[in-house]
């Protein structure tokens, strides 16, 4: 019995473990339904996410052409709804292009070129 336990222990350690997760398809990173789900996050949820990440965008406000101030979270939400995109897609883009989600002190250039397209 003792030899059987040792053999079982050795086989358990030496045999490769096969992961039983979902397989990755490089041609389908995100589904169309997820990508275009504009209602996935509210403006308030975006704001909480930015605050949780310590993003400078959590405190960033800007003024629109009518002279109204609005938050970065509102800007993200409005863009997502206008263009029928998941707000998470825009959050990923902001992080990918200028690290604006996790950067507590972005430069003016980083903000101006937030999504890879500049404000000139």
Where are the model-predicted features located?
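Hydrophobic h-region of N-terminal signal peptides that target proteins for export
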Residues: 11-18
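Short, functionally critical alpha-helical segments immediately adjacent to catalytic or ligand/cofactor-binding
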Residues: 74-101
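N-terminal export signals and maturation junctions of secreted/periplasmic proteins
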Residues: 19-73
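Short, solvent-exposed loop/turn and secondary-structure capping segments
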Residues: 20-21, 103-108
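Sec-dependent signal peptide recognition
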Residues: 2-10
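Long, contiguous hydrophobic alpha-helical segments, chiefly transmembrane helices and signal peptides
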Residues: 46, 90-96, 115-117
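Substrate-binding/active-site groove segments that recognize
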Residues: 107-120
């Amino acid at each position: 019995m003792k030899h059987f336990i040792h053999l079982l222990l050795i086989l358990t350690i030496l045999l490769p473990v096969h992961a039983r997760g979902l397989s990755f398809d490089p041609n389908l990173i995100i589904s169309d339904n997820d990508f275009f789900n504009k209602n996935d996050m509210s403006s308030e949820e975006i704001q909480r996410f930015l605050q949780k990440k310590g993003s400078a965008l959590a405190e960033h406000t800007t003024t629109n052409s009518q002279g109204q101030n609005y938050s970065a979270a509102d800007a993200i939400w409005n863009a997502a709804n206008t263009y029928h995109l998941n707000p998470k897609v825009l959050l990923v883009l902001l992080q990918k292009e200028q690290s604006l989600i996790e950067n507590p002190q972005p430069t003016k250039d980083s903000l101006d070129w937030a999504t890879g397209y500049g404000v000139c």
